[in-house]
Amino acid sequence: MSRKTRLLELMMKRETLRLRQKADALCGLVGDQTRLSDLDEKLADLILENSKNHGSQTVSALRSQAFYGREMAEKREFAQNRLEFLGREIVTAQTQLAQSKQKEKMIEERASQERRLLAQDALDLADRLRPAQKIER
């Protein structure tokens, strides 16, 4: 194996590791997005339930309901902002993953081409070193 072939093989392994890391990061982002969207749905249900009229209430119950309504609305707004951010991050991570896959493919093609050239050079050298045979008629 030539030095260039070995370097290309090492580059390919390094790129494969990077690809794996980027894929793991993408899976983490998607998992976060799923959990956060579930939380957003639960908060929406709680806000809807809290906003229903429960008949006559005391002043402290109304204050409590208003306080919890504001708190849930703030949490939901935070969750929605985070979901929007995660959406952008997922798109970025997918783009980087695709670029990394393309780079790995290019390095793999260069390594296989180098291996073919090395094998062809070895065959050519063997043909040159082989003694000439006489053809009898």
Regions found by a protein language model. Give the residues of each.
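Charge-rich amphipathic alpha-helical interaction elements
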Residues: M1-R137
